[in-house]
Structure formats: structure tokens, C-alpha cells
């Protein structure tokens, strides 16, 4: 076997392989003999068909079959011999396939990029320094009360924060428009869930009132025939309800799994959860800054086959997030909506893998178990979760990858200029959310 390799780009190789004619012809002859023993032809007893007849009748079909197998076998031998690291499947085409001649085929494939990591030593990374105060706990408890509030009818004018029960019908000029009517609709004023200007005109209304509300649909409204149109809604108010917050008592705190210790135990539990959330937010913010710096310092080429694989994974995730069901055909989602994000994720993954390799990082069984135990604390039956993860090789490998990723990020932070920045609990969470939002916005812009 003769092999030559041509680099057509940083990550593409064109491999030409020649297989001696004698080897091919011998393999074809052997397969024809096997065929002669097993095939049935009218006028011949099984196993007694002359080889010349078998060759005439099945020769091309057998040769195609043998050549296909030999190309697959010799492709594997060739990339092993040339120490190539393929990313995805190759495109293989025979260029010479004739009896008595050496078989020649060309395999075009993408390979993983080879590169040396550039340092991020000049990058400044902000690390939020925050703590959960008593005031933060008070605010969180108020938020929990609001989330568990009940609506109670009130005999007064509606105010922001109240809920009104209404019938409405929308008109363009004198004609009602499709989808613009509802009965018994419950609307929280100030929620901004309706067209701009609609909710504001219901402030001050009482049960039994009938109003005409004039609004203008936004220019970017999802229903194109309504975008930018002026409309009038005829509205009847049936009920005004105020929000009644529950008292922080034993009944309330039991909703959150606190059976003993009263309000003090509840506050301690809330604070513990907030501290965990804060820790995760700080970790994620620092991590994302480090990964962004790593990618900017190392703009490596990415195999298209890996981008395509990641794109399909992102499409499946999107289908799950939007509740499209297991039977949904993700091919209906355009690849271009996910391609840029997929490329970034693959690029970061390759860079992190190189950080792990260069620094000879590994994750011990104890480290994997500790991470599983940490994750399991989020569930009601942690013991079952731990057992499931540790006995499932696929899940265990995912945890190992997570541990290695964190170790790689720690190595990056050793290079970078990490600056501690004092901020409040809310500011720390907002900083993390803003960074995530900026990344999502950038993805939307590049996909637009």
C-alpha cells in the first residue's frame, strides 16, 4: 500500500491510497469462489457453477463489494500510518478501479487542528466579591411571598399590581379583527403582558366599568397585519382583585420543606440557597470571562463536521426547551440559527482539551464522587442520584469532563490578572446575568 497526504487547508487533508492490483484481484477471486459455492442459478447444481459463469454473471457486483471493503480497511490503515486524527467521516472516491491495475482512491477528510496555546496573561478578569446579608434574605422572603400570593376581590379602583378580570374585543376602524377578543381574561396591571398602553388605561377602573381603549400596535408586532396599526378595544371589567401576601408562619415555611425550627430555620435555609446561587453566579462569571479570553487569544480553525454535530445537538436542546416533543423533526430548524454558537462551543472545547493535555490534568475517582455528591444535594433523594451517576458510565464521564473543565479554567486563572471587585448580592447576580445576556445577544446578531 502506498499513501500520500496533501494538506489542502489547516484542517483538511487529501489522502491518496494505492493498493496493489494483486491484492485486489486475489480478494476478488476469493470472493467469487465463495459466491460460486452459495449462489443458485437455473441449470446448475448448487456449488457446481463454473467460475467463469460466476465471474461473468456476478464479477462487477463482487468487485464493487470487495473494493468498497478494501477502501474502508486501507483508509483506516492509511490514517494510522500517517498519524492523522480525523474529525468526522471522510469522503472516499475511487480514482482507478480496473481489473489488473492498482486500486487507487482518494479520501478527503477534516482533522483536528494542531496548535500551540497562546497565554491570556495580559487579560484582566473581574471576580465579584459579595455576601448574602440579612437585608438580602428579607428581600428574598418578600419575593417568595409574592410568588405565593393569592388574589382577593376588592371594592375599589384598580391600581398597578392588581389583577382585573375583563372581556375585550379589538377593532381596526369599525371591523373586529381575528384573535383580538377574549372573555374572562385575567390581567395583572403593570405586568406589560399586553400591547403598550393597554394596561395603563385600566388603572382606575372598577368592576362593572365599560371602557374604550385606544392603542397602536408596535411596528415589530408578530402579527404582520396588525403591526403599526391603530386599534380600539372595547373592554368590560368584571372584577378587580388585590394581591394578598401570605404570612411567614409555620404553614408558609412548610411549603419549602422546613418542618422544624420555625422561621429561624427557614431563614437559614433561604440564606444557604442564596449563598449557593451567589457562588454559582460568581464562578460562572469568572469562568465565562476566562473562556472568552482563551478564545480571543486562540482563534483556531474548527472542522465543519464538528460544527455540524454540535449544531444538531443545539437544535435538539432547543426543541426540548420549547416543548416540541420527542417526535419533532429538528431538521425543520434552520442550521444557520445555531451554527455560530456551535462553532464557538466546539472551538472552546478544543482549546480546553488542549489546556487539559498540556497541563496533564486528570480527575480522580474521589473528585468525581465529590462532584456527584455536590450535585445530588439539589434533589430530595440524593442517595439515589449518587448511585445513578456512579453506576452509569456515560453520566460518570460527563461529571469527569465537568471536573476537568473546572481544573482547566483554574489553570487559565493562574495566568490571567484576576481583580476582586466588591459588590452586593444583587449586583453580583446582575453582573452574571448581563454577561449571559450579552453572549445571547451577540449570538442573535451573528445569526440574524
Curated annotation (Swiss-Prot):
One of its GO terms (biological process) is protein unfolding. Residues 437-448 have a biased composition (Acidic residues). Pfam families: FKBP_C (PF00254), Trigger_C (PF05698), Trigger_N (PF05697). HAMAP family: Trigger_factor_Tig (MF_00303). This is Trigger factor. Keywords: Cell cycle, Cell division, Chaperone, Cytoplasm, Isomerase, Rotamase. It is found in: Cytoplasm. Consists of 3 domains; the N-terminus binds the ribosome, the middle domain has PPIase activity, while the C-terminus has intrinsic chaperone activity on its own. It comes from the Bacteria. GO terms for cellular component: cytoplasm. It comes from Chromohalobacter salexigens (strain ATCC BAA-138 / DSM 3043 / CIP 106854 / NCIMB 13768 / 1H11). Its EC number is 5.2.1.8.
Amino acid at each position: 500500500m502506498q499513501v500520500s497526504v496533501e494538506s489542502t487547508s489547516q484542517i483538511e487533508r487529501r489522502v491518496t491510497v494505492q493498493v496493489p492490483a494483486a491484492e485486489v484481484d486475489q480478494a476478488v477471486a476469493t470472493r467469487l469462489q465463495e459466491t460460486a459455492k452459495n449462489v443458485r442459478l437455473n441449470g446448475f447444481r448448487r456449488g457446481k457453477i463454473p467460475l467463469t459463469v460466476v465471474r461473468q454473471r456476478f464479477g462487477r457486483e463482487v468487485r464493487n463489494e470487495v473494493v468498497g471493503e478494501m477502501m474502508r480497511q486501507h483508509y483506516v490503515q492509511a490514517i494510522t500510518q500517517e498519524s492523522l486524527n480525523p474529525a468526522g467521516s471522510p469522503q472516499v472516491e475511487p480514482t482507478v478501479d480496473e481489473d489488473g491495475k492498482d486500486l487507487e482512491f482518494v479520501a478527503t477528510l477534516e482533522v483536528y487542528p494542531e496548535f500551540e496555546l497562546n497565554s491570556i496573561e495580559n487579560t484582566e478578569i473581574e471576580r465579584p466579591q459579595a455576601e448574602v446579608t440579612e437585608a438580602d434574605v428579607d428581600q428574598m422572603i418578600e419575593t417568595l411571598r409574592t410568588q405565593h400570593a393569592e388574589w382577593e376581590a376588592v371594592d375599589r379602583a384598580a391600581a398597578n399590581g392588581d389583577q382585573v378580570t375583563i372581556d375585550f374585543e379589538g377593532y381596526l376602524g369599525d371591523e373586529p379583527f381575528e384573535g383580538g377578543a377574549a372573555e374572562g381574561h385575567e390581567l395583572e396591571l403593570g405586568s406589560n403582558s399586553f400591547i403598550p398602553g393597554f394596561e395603563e388605561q385600566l388603572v382606575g377602573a372598577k368592576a362593572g366599568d365599560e371602557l374604550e381603549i385606544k392603542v397602536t400596535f408596535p411596528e415589530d408586532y408578530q402579527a404582520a397585519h396588525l403591526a403599526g396599526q391603530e386599534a380600539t378595544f372595547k373592554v368590560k371589567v368584571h372584577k378587580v382583585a388585590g394581591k394578598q401576601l401570605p404570612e411567614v408562619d409555620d404553614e408558609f415555611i412548610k411549603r419549602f420543606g422546613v418542618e422544624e425550627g420555625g422561621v429561624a430555620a427557614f431563614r437559614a435555609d433561604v440564606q444557604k440557597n442564596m449563598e449557593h446561587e451567589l457562588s454559582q453566579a460568581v464562578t460562572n462569571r469568572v469562568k465565562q470571562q476566562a473562556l472568552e479570553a482563551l478564545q480571543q487569544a486562540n482563534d483556531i480553525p474548527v472542522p465543519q463536521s464538528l460544527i455540524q454535530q454540535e449544531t444538531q445537538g443545539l437544535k435538539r436542546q432547543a426543541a426540548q426547551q420549547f416543548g416540541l416533543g420527542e417526535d419533532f423533526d429538528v431538521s425543520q430548524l434552520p442550521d444557520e440559527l445555531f451554527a455560530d454558537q456551535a462553532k464557538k462551543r466546539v472551538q472552546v472545547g478544543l482549546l480546553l482539551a488542549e489546556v487539559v493535555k498540556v497541563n496533564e490534568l486528570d480527575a480522580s475517582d474521589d473528585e468525581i464522587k465529590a462532584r456527584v455528591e455536590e450535585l445530588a444535594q439539589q434533589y430530595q433523594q440524593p442517595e439515589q442520584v449518587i448511585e445513578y451517576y456512579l453506576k452509569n458510565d456515560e453520566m460518570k464521564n460527563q461529571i469527569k469532563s465537568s471536573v476537568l473543565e473546572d481544573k482547566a479554567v483554574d489553570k487559565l486563572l493562574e495566568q490571567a490578572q484576576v481583580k476582586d471587585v466588591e459588590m452586593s448580592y444583587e449586583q453580583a447576580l446582575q453582573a452574571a446575568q448581563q454577561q449571559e445576556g450579552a453572549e445571547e445577544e451577540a449570538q442573535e446578531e451573528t445569526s440574524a
